[in-house]
Amino acid sequence: MQIGEYELTFIDVAVFVVFLVALNKIVKRMLVAKINEPAKYEIEQLEERDMTMEEIESMRREENRCLVIVEDKIYDLSGSQDLYDNNRDLFESSEGCGPEWAPICARKYPFVGHVLKN
């Protein structure tokens, strides 16, 4: 292919394509740097203390906390609102979750305290 008096070679086309790809990556990085992750579920952590069922229920209602009871331990799932909403009936039962949730909650979510029996 000839442009004016200059004939393009394979190397010229390859250098031009590499230049365009590099320019595209630079522009994408500049645009991505300006997009921040939403602070959707950022909630300050609760201090560790034991609570009764009434206190847990009031914190769920008044402070919109996603408190989950697993084997008499309380975990705060407020950082995972979607998980809590999808399993709300299980998490808000008075008996709490089954033992299969214990390793998941212990590994991923902050421990809040123990459930006090009345």
Curated annotation (Swiss-Prot):
Top-rank taxon, per record: Eukaryota
InterPro entries: Cyt_B5-like_heme/steroid_sf
Protein name: Uncharacterized protein K10D2.5
Originating species: Caenorhabditis elegans
